[in-house]
UniProtKB/Swiss-Prot annotation:
UniProt xrefs under PROSITE patterns: HSP70_1, HSP70_2, HSP70_3
Highest taxon of source: Bacteria
SUPFAM superfamilies, alphabetized: Actin-like ATPase domain, Heat shock protein 70kD (HSP70), C-terminal subdomain, Heat shock protein 70kD (HSP70), peptide-binding domain
Biased composition (Acidic residues): 597-609
Induction / repression: By stress conditions e.g. heat shock.
GO molecular function: ATP binding; ATP-dependent protein folding chaperone; unfolded protein binding
Protein name: Chaperone protein DnaK
CDD domains cross-referenced by the UniProt entry: ASKHA_NBD_HSP70_DnaK-like
Keyword annotations: ATP-binding, Chaperone, Nucleotide-binding, Phosphoprotein, Stress response
């Protein structure tokens, strides 16, 4: 049975881990890094993922970053005349993680646990699951990021404790409060903001730099796509540097030009200025912290440990704010970039039966219910209910002789239906005509362990039932998923062929070089016709390389290899004959010499002292 890998599919960076001999291990990417940028680029029909995609982002407008922010929406990105959904772009990232996990493990990988922000709604979870399927992965479980972090932190902890996980990633923010004890990880409350993260901290620096430059030169850099990408890179770098130093230099030469010539952006950004620019963002994270404490019925003094997750928690102002709010130093014993993937790998081990005595009790982040008369949102399942769960309620008709009932399924906290997120709609038909208030319609909500919702409506009079697994308006149909799976497989095949072709060209180049070296060495030592034959085969391979015809390169390379091999054998045979001849000559000389040898006689003389 194949291994279950744990994937942290992040807004800015992604990470993959696996359980080896009961120990979670982060798998490095081909560049040797333990996290991979969640960046996809398209260049002349070729797909670039990760480090290479991020490196060329400045010059390539067909580069997609932070696609996770659009999961569960009907957003599409158009690249080279083709429209891609967020699920497809995420699948390209997942495919890449899957491929280097397979290289590391030396076996195919088909199963995964993928993490999502705790505050992701049903549509976003469904989209993540679909992305996994498109990438050729069976998603065994969707697990919340803070819960995964708690799992990684608490697996070897003996004592009972209450922990608060503060997870500030590239594009999302979550807070979860969990109780740990005897292998049980129970989420008590979760809160968050799906549109707050490190990207927003970068943005305040970008806005500041744009404003400074505008005041100085009267040019708006935000209108220039390439300048904006350079600003984004510089802002991210400055933000990271300010976590360790109190000021940093931002230098962007030739960022723009006017009638007098090129213009450069040179400025110093202090940590104090950055903290002033981002103070409102830091304060925004405190709202969900207070909300989670309130929902769990706890005070800051009840929290034993604060676990920091996500690269953005390295910002000193963030750590200070947590310390002020909760009255304790955050725990620094986990790597904020890797802890979520490690937790996902542990959950994979739990599912596969490798990890024993661990029970994970997660919660639904948002209340679920239906629209009832007057546009009111009637909750069936309250937020922070432990999942999996099921809840039923009986409703009735609003008009006489009503034969159909529209079930409008919603997720959210607002009292009016229109203000909440629509998850789906379906109809229960063929209700026997009766006065209003007589028919009894039972609506049942089921939430599975992935946090995905299934709804049933049943007319208790006729026992007629209608059910749906929620597919959001942005959800993909089975046909679309199958088409995308096929395309992803074809692209993976095309990528594999491209890699093979590059390797073949490198091998052919190397062979041309070694052949030229060999021909110089064998000059005058082997038959001239043999050398000429090798020379011609080498020139034919060179010509094939220039034409870039892969099949021809392969044929010519094999032909040249064969000739060079024969040459080498002949050269070796010749060298062996020469060595033999020399040996024989040496042996004969030694024999002649022996005839003239005279045995000497000697007498031992002892010195008397």
């Amino acid at each position: 049975m194949s291994k279950i890998i744990g994937i942290d599919l992040g807004t800015t960076n992604s990470c993959v881990a696996v359980l080896e001999g009961g120990e979670p291990k982060v798998i490095p990417n081909p560049e040797g890094n333990r996290t991979t940028p969640s960046v996809v680029a398209f260049k002349n029909g070729e797909r670039l993922v990760g480090e290479v995609a991020k490196r060329q982002a400045i010059t390539n407008p067909n580069t997609i970053i932070s696609i996770k922010r659009h999961m569960g929406t009907d957003y599409k990105v158009e690249i080279e005349g083709k429209k891609y959904t967020p699920q497809e772009i995420s699948a390209i990232i997942l495919q890449y993680l899957k491929s280097y996990a397979e290289d590391y493990l030396g076996e195919p990988v088909t199963r995964a646990v993928i993490t999502v922000p705790a505050y992701f709604n049903d549509a976003q979870r469904q989209a993540t699951k679909d992305a996994g399927r498109i990438a050729g992965l069976e998603v065994e479980r969707i697990i919340n990021e803070p819960t995964a972090a708690a799992l990684a932190y608490g697996l070897d902890k003996e004592e009972d404790q209450t922990i608060l996980v503060y997870d500030l990633g590239g594009g999302t923010f979550d807070v979860s409060i969990l109780e740990l004890g005897d292998g049980v990880f129970e989420v008590k409350a979760t809160a968050g903001d799906n549109h707050l993260g490190g990207d927003d901290f970068d943005q305040v620096i970008i806005d500041y730099l744009v404003e400074q430059f505008k005041q100085e030169h009267g040019i708006d850099l935000s209108k220039d796509k390439m300048a904006l990408q350079r600003l984004k890179d510089a802002a991210e770098k400055a933000k990271k540097e300010l976590s360790g130093v109190t000021q940093t230099q931002i230098s962007l030469p030739f960022i723009s030009a006017n009638e007098t010539g090129p213009l450069h952006l040179e400025t110093t950004l202090t940590r104090a200025k950055f903290e002033e620019l981002s103070a409102h963002l830091v304060e925004r994270t405190m709202g969900p912290v207070r909300q989670a404490l309130q929902d769990a019925g706890l005070t800051p003094s009840d929290i034993d440990k604060v676990i920091l997750v996500g690269g953005s928690t390295r910002i000193p102002a963030v750590q200070e704010a947590i310390k002020r709010e909760l009255g304790k130093e955050p725990h620094k014993g986990v790597n904020p970039d890797e802890v979520v993937a490690i937790g996902a790998a542990i959950q994979g081990g739990v599912i596969a039966g490798e990890v024993k005595d661990v029970v994970l009790l997660d919660v639904t982040p948002l209340s679920l219910g239906i629209e009832t008369m007057g546009g009111v949102f009637t909750k069936l399942i309250e937020r922070n209910t432990t999942i999996p769960t099921s809840k039923s309620q009986i409703f009735t008709t609003a008009a006489d002789n009503q034969t159909t009932v529209d079930i409008h399924v919603l997720q959210g906290e607002r009292p009016m239906a229109a203000d909440n997120k629509t998850l789906g709609r379906f109809q229960l038909t063929d209700i026997p005509p009766a006065p209003r208030g007589v028919p009894q319609i039972e609506v049942t909500f089921d939430i599975d362990a992935n946090g995905i919702v299934h709804v049933r409506a049943k007319d208790l009079g006729t026992n007629k039932e209608q059910s749906i697994t929620i597919k959001s308006s942005s959800g993909l149909s089975e046909e679309e998923i199958q088409r995308m799976i096929k395309e992803a497989e074809e692209n993976a095949e095309a990528d594999r062929k491209r890699k093979e072709a590059a390797e073949l060209r490198n091998e052919a180049d190397q062979l041309v070089f070694t052949t030229e070296k060999t021909l110089k060495e064998v000059e005058g030592k082997v038959d001239e016709a043999e050398v000429k034959k090798a020379q011609e085969a080498k020139d034919a391979l060179k010509a094939a390389l220039e034409k870039n015809d892969i099949d021809d390169i392969r044929k010519k390379k094999e032909a040249l290899q064969e000739i060079v091999q024969q040459l080498s054998i002949k050269l070796y045979e010749q060298a062996a004959k020469q060595a033999q001849a020399q040996q024989q000559a040496g042996a004969g000389g030694a024999a002649k010499k022996d005839e003239n040898v005279v045995d000497a006689e000697f007498e031992e003389v002892k010195d008397d002292k």
